[in-house]
Amino acid sequence: GTHAFLALGNMLGVRWQEGAATLDVDFAHAGRNISIALPADLKIDVHDALESLEMGLLPIVQFNGKAGAQYRNPQDQELRLDFVTSKSRGHRSVVMNDLNLALEPLKFMEFSLEQTTQGCVFSNLGACIVNLPAPERFAVHKLIVFGERPVSERAKANKDLLQAASIASYFLANGQADVFNAAWRDAIGRGKGWRTRAEQG
C-alpha cells in the first residue's frame, strides 16, 4: 500500500504528506489468469530470499507447512510483509509452488489489479521499476477497503482515506477528475457491497 502510494507520487510528480504512510509492504499477484514472466525452470524460495535480508522477518506459517502470505518482525509489530491476490469464489489461498509461497486472497483486490502501470521506487542504493495499480483505481480501492477494516485497524483505515484523498485531489487539481470518476463509477457499478463500502470511504 504505502510503497505503491509513494511510487505513484513519483510517477505523478507529487510529494505526499508524511501522515499517509504505514510500514506494510504488499506484493500482489493478479491470480491464476496471469502468468509471471519467469523462465519455466526457475525456482525461488521466497522465505530464503527474505531471510537473507536479515530484517528479522518471520513467516506466519500455514498448516500445510508452506511459508504463509504474511511475514512479521517480532521486534517491530508495525513492519509487515503481505503477499496477496484476488479472492475467488473458492476463497482458498493461491499456492505458488515455484516460490514456496501462499498468497492471501483479499476481497476487492481485483479492482486494483485490473489496470496496472509502471512506476519507480527510489532508495539510497538506486531505483527499481515496479508494477503498480493505476492511481485512480488505487485511490478508489482504498475507499473500498476502508469499509472492510475492523475498528482495531482504525489508524490504518485513516491512512487509507488520506491516501485516497491525496490522489483524488491530484486528479481534481490537474483537470483530470473524469479519470477518477470513471474508476469510481466502475467500482460502484459492481454491486451493492462494492457501492456500500466505497460510499463509507
Language model features by range: what are they?
Residues T2-G201:
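Compositionally biased terminal segments of proteins
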